[in-house]
Amino acid sequence: NGKNPIVAHEFLGDNIDGKDIIIIDDMISSGGSMLDTAKQLKRMNARRVFICCTFGLFTDGLDAFDKAYEQGYFDKVVTTDLTYLPPELYSRPYFIEADMSKFIASLIDFMNHDVSLSNALATTEKIHGILEAYNNRTNIEFLTRD
């Protein structure tokens, strides 16, 4: 039937009470498992929940996401522009598009110049910069609810 039933969501780690949580997956198909996870995290008193994926397909439409957002189960959905996104998604207050055009252009440029892709793919320093900005609470207004 195309569905992948999830038997259980298990959380391993410290208490998440009052913390911001990021759920990361490669793809949102219908979004059911992501929304179930977000709901469970909110029940565990997560402060904010951010859903992130590479490919946001939204095969069952946006109604379930709209309802879950209205119920406060998540704060933002971030997905790349590496696949078709339904036009109505852009009007949703919870949606953030991660523009990958510069990254893809860099990959093409590296390949055209026969240069190793390792520098383009080694994003550890960028991640550390984002975490530092977050920890300093600077330049993160895009993460707040509208």
Go through each PLM region and give its residues.
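PRPP-associated nucleotide enzymes
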Residues: 1-146
